A protein has these predicted regions:
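Sec-dependent N-terminal signal peptides of Gram-positive bacterial secreted proteins and lipoproteins
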Residues: 2-24
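Sterically constrained small-residue positions within well-ordered secondary structures
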Residues: 14, 35, 45, 74, ...
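Proteolytic processing hotspots in large secreted/extracellular or virion-associated proteins
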Residues: 24-29, 102-153, 158
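Self-processing/autoproteolytic domain segments and adjacent N-terminal interaction modules in large
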Residues: 51, 55-131
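Proteolytic-maturation and junctional protease-sensitive modules
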Residues: 129-193
């Protein structure tokens, strides 16, 4: 009986510690809510300045909570999620966040940021190929319903690690949407200040 109590106690302790790590790095709903919609036509800009539009309906955004997501995308999202959880905090998972905030003169400690949305972004194959060319970007507008003036940090999961975007590539609009200039697609995390 004592051994059973010890085992149950250990399981409960591990569960409580996992919840604490989760609570520090993610909003409670990140694994339960739908992905934000794309609000308008996206624009691909090549290094030479040429532009191509991509219809919003051709951009697929799927949340970590999505039920019908391609197995490869789900595996990559799960891996991206686990990197933050296993590190124990955003500061440990993405040390570059501090530098990004400092360069943008944003006075928000990394410890105060949480992931509010974790999604996979996919585009048609011709756009994927275009983004492989150095200097080519796509600007996508996501319906996040955040207030103008809110600090929104965006990270992209690249080669097994999170890479924060320079804040000059993220624009919060008056309508609550957020324009993000990306140099690739795949898992994307939106971070906001935990208030």
């Amino acid at each position: 009986m004592k051994n059973l109590v010890r085992v149950v106690s250990c399981v409960l302790l591990v569960a409580m510690l996992s919840v604490a790590v989760f609570a520090d790095s993610f909003t409670a709903s990140v694994t339960q809510k739908d992905a934000p919609a794309v609000t308008k036509t996206a624009e691909v800009v090549a290094a030479d300045g040429s532009k191509v539009e991509v219809k919003a309906s051709d951009i697929k955004v799927e949340s970590v909570a999505a039920k019908s997501i391609a197995p490869e995308a789900k595996a990559e999202l799960d891996k991206a999620y686990d990197v933050i959880v296993k590190a124990g905090s955003l500061e440990k998972a993405v040390p570059e966040l501090k530098t990004v905030l400092k360069e943008a003169k944003i006075d928000v400690p990394v410890a105060n940021l949480v992931v509010r949305d974790l999604v996979n972004v996919s585009v048609p194959e011709d756009v994927v190929k275009a983004l492989e060319t150095e200097g080519t970007t796509i600007t996508v507008s996501f319906k996040l319903d955040v207030k103008e003036g809110t600090t929104v940090v965006v990270m992209r999961f690249v080669d097994g690690k999170w890479v924060p975007l320079a804040l000059e590539n993220v624009t919060v609009n008056k309508d609550g949407s957020v324009d993000v200039k990306l140099d690739g697609v795949g898992p994307i995390a939106f971070l906001v200040e935990n208030k």
